[in-house]
């Protein structure tokens, strides 16, 4: 798992580099980020949305991007709301309270997605989000350890 001290510190690039290294070394490798927040998304061949960073990480692995590589995506939409994308499909706009009320369901989706990748690939390079030291978010954190 790749973690950092905050947002914008290079986790996505480092994850892509590890993906490429292990792919070139002959491993069947895939990227994974449980939850991502970004204004822009990548649209798969199936018309599903996922994080752009996970899309280029998939390409570094020699793979077509799949939404299980980034099962939950939040797109800030203003007024403390975010559009929630689950497995590539929009679920509507939610504030933090409404989003966290679905924590158990989201955790199941994240776990199922990771399990599917682990069954298909020899290595799964996991990217964390923000900082794992944000104690106030620990109870709801789906992305870090």
Task: Give the location of each predicted region.
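Flexible phosphate-sensing "switch/lid" loops adjacent to ATP/NTP-binding sites
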Residues: 1-145
């Amino acid at each position: 798992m790749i973690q950092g001290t905050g947002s914008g510190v290079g986790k996505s690039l480092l994850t892509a580099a590890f993906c490429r290294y292990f792919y070139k070394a002959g491993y069947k490798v895939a990227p994974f980020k449980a939850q991502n927040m970004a204004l822009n998304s990548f649209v798969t061949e199936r018309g599903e949305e996922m994080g752009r960073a996970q899309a280029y990480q998939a390409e570094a692995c020699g793979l077509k991007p799949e939404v299980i590589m980034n099962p939950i995506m939040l797109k800030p939409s203003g007024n403390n709301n975010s559009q929630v994308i689950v497995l590539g499909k929009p679920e509507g706009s939610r504030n933090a309270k409404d989003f966290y009320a679905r924590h158990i369901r989201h955790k199941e989706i994240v776990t199922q997605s990771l399990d599917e990748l682990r069954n298909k690939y020899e290595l799964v390079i996991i990217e964390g989000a923000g900082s794992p030291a944000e104690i106030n978010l620990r109870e709801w954190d789906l992305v870090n350890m």
